[in-house]
UniProtKB/Swiss-Prot annotation:
Protein species of origin: Prochlorococcus marinus (strain NATL1A)
Swiss-Prot/TrEMBL catalytic activity: a plastoquinone + NADH + (n+1) H(+)(in) = a plastoquinol + NAD(+) + n H(+)(out); a plastoquinone + NADPH + (n+1) H(+)(in) = a plastoquinol + NADP(+) + n H(+)(out)
UniProt name for this protein: NAD(P)H-quinone oxidoreductase subunit 1
Binding partners and assembly: NDH-1 is composed of at least 11 different subunits.
Keyword tRNA processing belongs to the record: no
Length: 372
């Protein structure tokens, strides 16, 4: 958008105009970004599950959910309530501690990763300087929980699923990190807010997808593999492993895996939006919009409208990618485990290294275009 958009300042000034102190106005602002992220995560999962069911039904020439609310929109809530009231069973010969900790260790890093997702300049919980690498570090914890769940179940299918999950994550974590490193090199920052602001200097044409098309493809493939979406759902392949590492789980513990998968998918789509598609930026200039309605860009009304449009743009870009991921799941065949590992180690890793080298060379040759 524009460096002048500061929703926090506009909010505090508006509250102060009502007669409240600056300290109280700032205190009232603090929970708002957290509330936005929490609501976005919950609604994001519900909408994604509903889209998954409807798109899969369309792909298979079915109607899909239609009785739970209008167009079946309440079906995800019904699924959640069903899992909540089901009996929580721990297998007799399973390691009960690891069996319980595993799903928690899978879900918690995904939720913590939402700390660094910006919906606007001040609409994020934590603008840490190493935000994007913090996400990579947190995502590397998840396979430990998957392996722990597979091992503790005392089931051969669960163990194989856990081992596959660990191998898949290691194979795709490295090219994903190298693709992110190319973005960091151009942006001169690890902050997600700085990366978005750097993409909005010249509108649509300054988005990183035009300067990093190869990196965008690598990142998206690796993100799908990290989310274990088809064609990369080898750890839970139904035809081979029953349900993989989830085989022995039921009730709320199974729901944690279910929830983590969809939260991770929405999170990955949001990060692609932030890193490559300009985040909250949109083609219409805020300066042009403010002059059109005859108000200054510092006007609180313009600030609120601009921030709201930014949130909408971020979500629209993310859900375009979510729609693509769901469509891929129901229209592509599953790859074999050897093909999956070959793709990660023999293709994506060398290509991501070459992409990083080319980015460094272009940064030296064209410092203005590539963020010198």
């Amino acid at each position: 958008m524009n460096s002048g958009i500061d929703l926090e300042m506009s909010f505090t000034q508006g509250v102060q105009n009502l007669g409240l102190s600056h300290e109280l106005a700032h205190l009232l602002w603090i929970p708002l970004p957290m509330l936005l992220v929490l609501v976005s995560a919950v609604i994001g999962v519900l909408v994604t599950v509903w889209l998954e069911r409807k798109i899969s039904a369309a792909a298979q020439q079915r109607i899909g959910p239609e009785y739970a609310g209008a167009l079946g929109i309440l079906q995800p809530m019904a699924d959640g309530l069903k899992l909540l009231v089901k009996e929580d069973i721990i297998p007799a010969r399973a390691d009960s501690v690891l069996f319980t900790v595993g799903p928690i260790l899978v879900l918690v890093p995904v939720i913590l990763s939402w700390l660094i997702v910006p919906f606007g300049q001040n609409l994020l919980i934590s603008n840490v300087g190493i935000g994007i690498f913090l996400w990579i570090a947190l995502s590397s914890i998840q396979p430990i929980g998957l392996l722990m769940s597979g091992y503790s179940s005392n089931n051969k299918y669960s163990l194989l699923g856990g081992l596959r999950a660990a191998a898949q994550s290691i194979s795709y974590e490295i090219p994903l990190a190298l693709a992110v490193l190319a973005i960091v090199m151009m942006s001169n920052s690890l902050s997600t807010v700085d990366i978005v602001e750097q993409q909005n200097t010249a509108g649509l044409l300054s988005w990183n997808i035009w300067r990093q098309p190869v990196g965008f493809i690598i990142f998206w493939i690796c993100a799908l593999a990290e989310c274990e979406r088809l064609p990369f759902d080898l750890p839970e392949a139904e035809e081979e492993l029953v349900a993989g590492y989830q085989t022995e789980y039921s009730g709320m513990k199974f729901a944690l895996f279910y929830l983590a998968g969809y939260i991770n998918l929405v999170l990955s789509a949001l990060l692609v939006s932030v890193l490559y598609l300009g985040g909250w930026g949109f083609p219409i200039s805020i300066d042009w919009f403010s002059s059109l309605i005859g108000l200054s860009i510092d006007n609180p009304l313009v600030q609120i409208i601009a921030a709201s449009l930014g949130i909408v743009m971020t979500i629209l870009k993310a859900y375009l990618l979510v729609f693509l991921a769901i469509l891929l799941r129901w229209t592509t065949p599953r790859v074999r485990i050897d093909q999956l590992l070959d793709l990660g180690w023999k293709f994506l890793l060398p290509i991501s290294l070459v992409n990083l080298l080319v980015t460094a060379s272009l940064k030296l040759a064209f410092p203005i275009t590539f963020g010198g």
